[in-house]
């Protein structure tokens, strides 16, 4: 739930669902520009001079009961939304604006009521707002990094049956062990970067665009002009939240059977519907399309056209030649293998290229920084508010920086506490995890924990330069290395998937916390309050997210199955990666490996071309990561997203100012309303209440057969 500037690396972060582990993926440039424009006149004076007369509360007073009550409420809301997105397509847009707006609205309403009754003891400050933002990001982020749509669900028998490798080991979800696993692995990353906070934020002056933009959002809320706009945005969000919720409620009445309802409307005809080209009336993905950059939506649509419009129909003609003609459509020895492994090849190619690119930037930037203290890292990073090269005579820079640095260094977190916490949690985790996963030997875990601080630093440093977390890439690296080390005969698949979870949680939370330190630095929030808020939010997420997943798991018996409401596509992808790591490529159908190599190379080539072209032309090159998603799922959600883009495009042409101010609020309302409908729909399913009507679309010929059958049976 972070915001930042628009760039190709961050565009990928929005679409690869794993890269939402930076909290939530960054917002687009239009949202950032909106906040900058709102604050433009104020910043001419200096941001901190605006707040100079307001007392900065101590770190303990920043941690209020009302802040954590609001955070808990919002965490439940956003956990449902993220879980639904995780289990449908895996595309999780930035919900940062929603969290910031709703957090501001709830506490502001609370304090206003107390003020009228004469019971208000502490005003609502930007520091408290930052605590809420941090807590909600940490909590609902577990709904993603917990692996409910990836590595964790990929261990289940339901996913293993689709992959045809049940014998390789399964571990079905259970509320007890999932909560225990998350508590064991989710806190370690927080301690790994605490000693480096001053180096990252003050000495290296890393910009962390998402954290900086989030701070701008919060600062703007607490100015008179920003508060007025925030109230209007909340009203708009609430209006479209209600519209989206009741639209989902209305659609539910017509889903009383398989492939029933508006979500199966054959918009472009039945033949196109067969290849998943249709508009499914999803308010969620229309909203996602309004938030995601245009190039993301176009890339996803192009990927859908390339795969479902061209490749899969052609490969289907090779049935009986390239693969057996008697295997079911879901078999990994048939067409399904091409869908999954070609998508995996593109994801790995794109991930490998960008891993090398970000790592090279990280190492070169670090080398330059260590060589000379006067050399600024900002040459290879994004500049939002701070300019390390600014003249020391600049009153704005000197005053703001001095005040922020003074408050940032005021509350120190002892190094012994961070080191001791890391060692204690690592030792506890090393002892407990082998009992949860007997395939994951204690020495595998020990190796991960020895390497983790270095990788966590690299990830946090790289995020400061590029605003892009590579946690999912480190997780995939763990799948292959630990899986191959364990071997096929010793449970390598489960060991690799479990190791993926351990690694992802460490490096993900490390970059998240460093982003939060940057946000806290710019809002004068104490590092101690940021750390405590992150810990409490993570603890909330370790309980809330498994409970939300469990509700989905118990309510929908077809969860994780292809062509259902919740196919959980990346669970199959992650298990396929683990299978590839322990078995090699011998089990793939004919020509599948050749196609995988080809698309792996094409993904790297497209990235090279995109980065080598001038930004004016490179921004038109599609993103391989985005193109890979519909290879497995189909292009129906891409059509929804493009509809969202079209709505926003027309709105910007008609009234650009209102589109900038309220576009994200409208999109967030659409996403939140449809997402929260998952709660009552799950409860209805558990209670055995079924929709009363099945609205299904048939061809004329099929309809005649059905009519004749019904007449004959009367």
Swiss-Prot record:
It is found in: Membrane. Pfam families: OPT (PF03169). InterPro entries: OPT, YSL-like. Residues 17-44 are annotated as: Disordered. It is a multi-pass membrane protein. One of its GO terms (cellular component) is membrane. Residues 27-36 have a biased composition (Basic and acidic residues). Coiled coil: none annotated. The chain crosses the membrane at residues 67-87, 90-110, 135-155, 175-195, 236-256, 295-315, 340-360, 413-433, 445-465, 477-497, 531-551, 593-613, 631-651. Belongs to the YSL (TC 2.A.67.2) family. May be involved in the transport of nicotianamine-chelated metals. This is Probable metal-nicotianamine transporter YSL5. It comes from Arabidopsis thaliana. The gene is YSL5.
